[in-house]
């Protein structure tokens, strides 16, 4: 897959393409459904397939007080897009100037003149251009004027629900990780660096790695204890473990922390990059009467996870 950053200029060797455009947060199954049509059509027509996306969420530019909670920061999004088999990803720098372009000018100046889009697939509910004021019928008319075919992709439904980034975020925010996995098409993941923690887990017999997220805009699941798989650094192995998200109420904590205990692992993780894939939520976080009572519950949590993962 070739990645192009438009603010650095547009390559002169771009061929005519079949393309689609969007922010693609999560690259969920609805996105995958749309992109599969782009890739298949491009192959049938002997053209390159292209995804056009943005380096930041448009609302970050349009609303100064907006704080995004992303399913996938840019680099992870590019990794997931590469897995779809698309030929080219063009990353646009979304700024105030770009937000002022009408749909017509966006299609003419960027899609036609710079990216050589011959056929454009539009998601069933997607709009672009200044204030998102125009819709699919307008895009078709502009495309006809420019010699660009515009096609609307059908909706992708799962159990009667339109799969969208909003739906995926709602599941993650509620700790509904199995539902999130069904919508995303893969287990939700977060990554970061292991930093010094409180050492409380080690004293209880459950040493934990305290994770500092690589991107603070990342959406964090609801507080609770989760069954997870963990990858350390560049290792290919995903190890089973459990993660606590919350304020550590048994120890009087107030700030939310992300702590993961990896089963059957005794290595030193400080400074390492780790990635956590969420399988399911085991229970909510709660305050225990003593550290010993918490340790007993953690032992039960671990057994619950081992039993469930051995059966699944």
Language model features: what each stretch is:
Residues 81-82:
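ATP-dependent adenylation/nucleotidyltransferase module used to activate substrates
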Residues 197-312:
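Phosphate/ribose-recognition catalytic cores of enzymes acting on nucleotide-derived substrates
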Residues 11-73:
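N-terminal catalytic cores of NTP/NDP-binding nucleotidyl/phosphoryl-transfer enzymes
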Residues 69-77, 101-107:
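Glycine-rich, highly charged phosphate/nucleotide-binding loops
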Residues 2-9:
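Short acidic-hydrophobic, aromatic-tinged amphipathic segments that line or gate anion-handling sites
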Residues 97-207, 289-295:
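Classical nucleotidyltransferase
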């Amino acid at each position: 897959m070739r990645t192009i950053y438009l603010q650095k200029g547009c390559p002169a060797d771009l061929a005519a393409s079949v393309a689609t455009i969007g922010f693609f947060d999560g690259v969920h199954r609805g996105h995958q459904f749309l992109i599969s049509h782009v890739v298949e059509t491009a192959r049938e027509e002997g053209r390159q397939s292209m995804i056009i996306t943005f380096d930041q969420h448009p609302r970050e530019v349009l609303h100064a007080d907006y704080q995004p909670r992303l399913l996938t920061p840019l680099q992870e999004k590019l990794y997931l897009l590469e897995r779809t088999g698309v030929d080219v990803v063009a990353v646009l720098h979304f700024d105030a100037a770009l937000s002022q372009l009408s749909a017509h000018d966006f299609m003419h100046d960027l899609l036609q003149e710079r990216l050589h889009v011959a056929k454009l697939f539009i998601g069933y509910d997607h709009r672009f251009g200044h204030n998102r004021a125009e819709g699919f019928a307008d895009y078709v008319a502009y495309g006809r004027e420019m010699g660009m075919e515009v096609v609307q992709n059908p909706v992708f439904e799962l159990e009667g629900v339109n799969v969208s980034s909003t739906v995926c975020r709602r599941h993650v925010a509620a700790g509904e990780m199995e539902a999130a996995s069904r919508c995303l098409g893969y287990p939700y993941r977060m990554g970061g660096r292991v930093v010094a923690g409180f050492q409380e887990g080690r004293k209880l017999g459950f040493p934990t790695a305290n994770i500092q997220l690589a991107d603070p805009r990342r959406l964090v699941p609801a507080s609770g204890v989760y069954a997870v798989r963990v990858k350390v650094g560049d290792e290919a192995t995903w190890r089973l473990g459990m993660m606590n998200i919350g304020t550590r109420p048994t120890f009087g904590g107030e700030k939310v922390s992300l702590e993961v205990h990896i089963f059957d692992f005794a290595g030193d993780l400080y400074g390492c990059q780790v990635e956590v894939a969420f399988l399911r939520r085991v229970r909510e976080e709660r305050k225990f009467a003593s550290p010993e009572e918490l340790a007993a519950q953690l032992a039960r949590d671990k057994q619950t996870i081992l039993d469930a993962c051995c059966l699944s």
